[in-house]
């Protein structure tokens, strides 16, 4: 059917929704993602719409809203207006974020300037520890992690380097993709085809076939064999290893990969608005019900949802009003575990009622932040960690796959090269 994994979109009653990649960063001229788009020859097929540079992310905490502005000077100036006594600390914070990002050859595309020592240090120190050392205002320290749903950070676990990469990536510039993220998948397919490649849909890889030393083919749909020189898998590492029934992968490696913790799953409500009722939001909104963005993944039936991320879909052309939007909150796989093993659309009335109740609860919270929004929604649709598991194969229905934990160090890392020389 469709290609592109989480780049895919879906439509219901004429309304279009994105499933995964809702906005991108560092896509202005000369920036990292723009360079990659040009290299992949997709830049001319994709139309970007820049989010508000004065507040591309808005964090709502304890009844106040805080805007993240694009660019170092603008970001520091904006935050200093909220926290005048923290200016010097904000400069120190931002310079550290830049230093870590620039020291990554992958993040900066500047291999000669890579510096692994600083990244090694901040891969072993938690976000809250480092920010707590630099920022003396506890509220500002919380605001700076207000966008942590973008990477499902956990208190005392997620390394500061992860935070630095995300902050730098989006703070350089932030854009939505006009017409939907599936245009990226289509553009990538066009590039592959221009160079003589084929893009195959409805072809599920069921096995990576190896001889005594290397991969020689992939089996598709349990029957068709496609010979290969190289295999590059973008599936979850656990799913990839399941395809490799070979002694070339050591049992101890399989065990380590299977034991890596996963990021939390998500519950998503896709919103179809009534025509010309909801003004288009040119920013992302992070709302919190308690006094901190931390620990939203630790909830009870009564306290859920502790936080949410709310965004609008960017239609083609200039739009004054939004047609669709999305609201996302954390959800643990255990909440839907009893329906595991059922198929999409056939999970039963109990599952549908579970989703309806969760959606209404999440919409009630959204109404607190945007009064009147509930009456402007004509239809909505939902997804759970089970949906992620079924459509993407991500372990435990996690939003971002493997989690990073400073206490596990290298045990959390997955090498891009396997012991099979032509499998990545």
PLM regions: where:
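N-terminal glycine-rich phosphate/pyrophosphate-binding loop and immediately adjacent elements
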Residues: 1-96
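General small-molecule cofactor/ligand-binding pocket signal
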Residues: 47-49, 198-200, 378
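Mid-domain catalytic core of redox enzymes
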Residues: 176, 206-320
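Helical element adjacent to the flavin cofactor pocket in flavoenzyme catalytic cores
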Residues: 164-219
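A short, glycine/Asx- and small/polar-enriched loop/turn
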Residues: 62-63, 153-158, 209-216, 321-323
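C-terminal segments that line or cap access tunnels to active or ligand-binding sites in enzymes
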Residues: 274-386
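Rossmann-like flavin
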Residues: 61-158
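A glycine-rich dinucleotide-binding beta-alpha-beta segment and adjacent secondary-structure elements
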Residues: 139-155, 368-424
């Amino acid at each position: 059917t469709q290609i592109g994994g989480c780049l895919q979109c879906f439509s219901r009653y004429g309304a279009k929704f994105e499933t995964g990649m809702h906005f991108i960063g560092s896509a202005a001229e000369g920036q990292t993602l723009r360079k990659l788009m040009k290299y992949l020859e997709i830049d001319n097929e994709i139309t970007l719409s820049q989010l508000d540079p004065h507040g591309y992310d808005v964090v709502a905490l304890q009844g106040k809203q805080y805007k993240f502005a694009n660019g170092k000077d603008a970001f520091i100036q904006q935050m200093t207006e909220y926290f005048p006594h923290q200016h010097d600390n904000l400069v120190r914070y931002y310079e550290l974020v830049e230093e870590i990002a620039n020291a990554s050859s992958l993040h900066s595309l500047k291999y000669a300037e890579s510096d692994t020592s600083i990244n090694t240090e901040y891969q072993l120190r938690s976000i809250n520890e480092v920010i707590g050392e630099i920022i003396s205002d506890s509220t500002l320290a919380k605001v700076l992690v207000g966008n942590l749903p973008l990477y499902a950070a956990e208190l005392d676990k997620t390394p500061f380097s992860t935070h630095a990469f995300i902050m730098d990536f989006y703070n350089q510039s932030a854009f939505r993709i006009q017409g939907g993220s599936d245009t990226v998948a289509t553009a990538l397919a066009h590039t592959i085809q221009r160079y003589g490649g084929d893009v195959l849909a409805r072809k599920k890889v069921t096995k990576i076939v190896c001889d005594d030393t290397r991969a020689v083919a992939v089996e598709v749909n349990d029957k068709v064999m496609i010979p290969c020189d190289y295999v590059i898998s973008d599936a979850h590492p656990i799913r990839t290893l399941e395809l490799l029934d070979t002694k070339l992968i050591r049992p101890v490696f399989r065990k380590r990969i299977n034991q890596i913790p996963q990021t939390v799953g998500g519950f998503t409500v896709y919103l179809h608005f009534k025509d010309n009722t909801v003004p288009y939001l040119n920013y992302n909104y992070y709302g919190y019900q308690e006094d901190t963005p931390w620990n939203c993944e630790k909830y009870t039936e009564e306290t859920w949802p502790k936080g949410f991320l709310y965004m609008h879909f960017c239609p083609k052309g200039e739009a004054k009003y939004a047609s669709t939007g999305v609201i996302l909150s954390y959800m643990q796989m255990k909440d839907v575990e009893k329906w595991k093993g059922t198929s999409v659309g056939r999970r039963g009335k109990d599952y549908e009622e579970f989703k309806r109740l969760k959606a209404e609860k999440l919409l009630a919270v959204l109404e607190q932040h945007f009064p009147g929004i509930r009456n402007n929604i004509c239809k909505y649709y939902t997804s759970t960690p089970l949906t992620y598991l079924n459509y993407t194969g991500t372990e435990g229905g996690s939003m971002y796959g493997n989690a990073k934990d400073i206490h596990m160090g290298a045990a959390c890392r997955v090498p891009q090269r396997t012991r099979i020389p032509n499998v990545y």
